[in-house]
């Protein structure tokens, strides 16, 4: 009986991870559509080992989401909708809080938008240089 319960927990966790992957894929698409940029400016990476999701973006997105009120509000509202979390904007950091812990979902998720330029070659090549880290606690 104990093994069955453990298996169900693993399946639930896997389903939760799949949900987050789908939700962030949709977020990425909506951000690209909203900014009306023909080429892709956002991509995401989910690391199952660290359980962290990264949304990578170009400098244009890094500037737009904070400086264009409509873009900022749209992203915040969409994140509220897909995450089921209360979302608070604190400067460049979005803080998610969830009232009830469930299926290992942390009570607080900090989403930190930051420009992260590794070297000038990446910048000149137009590579993705920023990332949004979801830090679970």
UniProtKB/Swiss-Prot annotation:
Induction: Expressed in the late phase of the viral replicative cycle.
Superkingdom to which the source organism belongs: Viruses
Record's GO cellular component terms: host cell cytoplasm; virion component
Record carries keyword Chaperone: no
Localization of this protein: Virion; Host cytoplasm
Entry annotated with the keyword Lipid biosynthesis: no
Alphabetical UniProt keywords: Host cytoplasm, Late protein, Virion
Family to which the UniProt record says this protein belongs: Belongs to the asfivirus A137R family.
Purpose of the protein: Plays a role in the inhibition of the host innate immune response. Mechanistically, promotes the autophagy-mediated lysosomal degradation of host TBK1 and affects IRF3 nuclear translocation to block type I IFN production.
Subunit organization: Interacts with host TBK1.
Protein name according to UniProt: Structural protein A137R
Species whose genome carries this gene: African swine fever virus (isolate Warthog/Namibia/Wart80/1980)
